[in-house]
From Swiss-Prot:
Activity sensitivity to pH: Optimum pH is 6.8-8.2.
GO terms (BP aspect): nicotinate catabolic process
Source organism (scientific name): Eubacterium barkeri (Clostridium barkeri)
UniProt activity-regulation remark: Inhibited by oxidized glutathione, p-chloromercuriphenylsulfonic acid and iodoacetic acid. Not inhibited by the chelating agent alpha,alpha-dipyridyl. Activity is slightly increased by EDTA. Not activated by Fe(2+), Mg(2+), Mn(2+) or Ca(2+). Unaffected by K(+), Na(+), NH4(+), Rb(+) or Li(+).
Gene that this polypeptide is encoded by: mii
EC number annotated for this UniProt entry: 5.3.3.6
Protein name, per record: 3-methylitaconate isomerase
Keyword line: Isomerase
Pathway: Cofactor degradation; nicotinate degradation; propanoate and pyruvate from 6-hydroxynicotinate: step 6/8
Pfam families: PrpF
Quaternary state and interactors: Homotetramer.
Function of the molecule: Catalyzes the reversible isomerization of (R)-3-methylitaconate to 2,3-dimethylmaleate. Has very low isomerase activity with itaconate.
Taxonomy of the source species: Bacteria, Bacillati, Bacillota, Clostridia, Eubacteriales
Length: 380
């Protein structure tokens, strides 16, 4: 008998993230054992994740578990997990919008969904939130199309476009677009009171003014991640808000058991800044607001898909901190969010507190398929 388990595996780049895609029936049914297997697949806990497939970056330490739909209106079930790099934690408390963009193509290629040319619409049941997502995937020769002329900032080259619709994800974690009922709350912190907006669309997100955390909002990843005091303060705010909206009982529990969600971002009005990935200047005229999003206690080098849907929705709710810094876009439904590596546009329509549209364009590509091996002795 082999001393290693062999598990079918696919690695996909989805949006500006990269993840491991597994079928649910290829994993142990017991949750505790399943999480041990997942940690070994990724090589966690280890700062380098050297003994697993992950890449020692929060944006590549992501998992999608796919299975037949348990929802009457959906085509496929999808469970997302953020796998901690340094701790033995598999966080199922929210969804990843970028990884979601890989689910439709995976479902088509693995025959969970019948391929229809030239475009297949896949209804995805996200089990983390109980919400439905919709992916419009271009199809060619019975498989998800890869080549195309769609460029998304943060990914080299171009690929086939995919529309991801998060319009049905309002109140994903808390049941309400505004979990506290307020557009702005005043939070007591170790550095004094600070205004926060907590909005729950696709995933719950916390928004603060960049100036209130002594930042401009246009800083590069190195500057932000090198500021230990800032990182600690943002995590304090995030943990307090996590407790406030009922996602954790204590701040300690929020940091240890729900490190990924809710996310927190600091925002500012449109202005010029430098794309850290290319060195090019992004004009303030090309964005409607600028945001820096924290994820797993470090800066997200681009912008999370779910946070994009949430930020766009927050921008359309009068009085929120995001709305306060939003450029006047007139009748235009698209909100252009400036992030460290470019701009991400999102179609955002909110009327009378109801999210009518939250959609963005992503691309995805299957990189590898094969088997991942897990040492059985390490599962004890």
């Amino acid at each position: 008998m082999s001393d290693q388990m062999r598990i079918p595996c696919v690695i996909m780049r989805a949006g500006t993230s990269k993840g491991i895609f597994l079928k649910g029936n290829d994993l142990p049914a017991d949750q505790e054992l399943r999480d041990k297997v997942i940690l070994r697949i990724f090589g966690s806990p280890d700062v380098r994740q050297i003994d697993g497939l992950a890449g020692a970056d929060p944006l590549t330490s992501k998992l999608a578990i796919i299975g037949p739909s348990t929802h009457p209106d959906a085509d496929v079930d999808y469970t997302f997990a953020q796998v901690s790099i340094t701790d033995a934690v598999v966080d199922y408390n929210g969804n990843c919008g970028n990884i979601s963009a890989g689910v439709g193509p995976f479902a088509i290629d693995e025959s969970f969904v019948k391929a229809v040319e030239p475009m297949t619409r896949v209804c995805i049941h996200n089990t983390n939130t109980g919400k439905l997502l919709y992916a419009e995937v271009e199809v060619e020769d019975g498989k998800a199309k890869v080549s195309g002329d769609c460029k998304i900032d943060g990914v080299p080259g171009t690929n086939a476009p995919e529309l991801m619709d998060f319009s049905d994800t309002a109140g994903a974690a808390t049941g309400k677009v505004l979990p506290t009922g307020n557009v702005v709350d005043v939070l007591s912190t170790s550095k004094g009171d600070i205004d926060v907006s907590i909005v729950d669309v696709a995933n719950p997100c916390i928004f603060v003014h960049a100036k209130d955390v002594n930042m401009t909002g246009t800083e590069t990843p190195d500057v932000i991640n090198g500021n230990a005091d800032l990182l600690a303060y943002l995590e304090e705010i995030r943990a307090k808000c996590c407790v406030k909206i009922g996602m954790a009982a204590t701040e300690k529990e929020a940091s240890e058991k729900s490190p990924a969600f809710p996310m927190i971002a600091f925002v500012t009005k449109p202005e010029d800044y430098v794309d850290f990935s290319t060195g090019n200047t992004i004009s303030g005229d090309d964005v409607d607001l600028v945001s820096r999003l924290m994820f797993m206690q470090v800066l997200h080098k681009t912008y999370a898909g779910t946070a994009t849907a949430c930020t766009g929705s927050a921008a359309r709710i009068p009085g929120t901190i995001v709305n306060q810094v939003l450029r006047d876009t007139g009748d235009e439904d698209t909100v252009r969010i400036g992030h460290p590596a470019g701009v991400i546009p999102v179609v955002s329509i909110v009327k009378d507190g109801k999210v009518e549209k939250a959609a963005l364009i992503r691309t995805a590509r299957r990189i590898m398929e094969g088997y991942v091996y897990v040492e059985k002795a390490k599962l004890v």
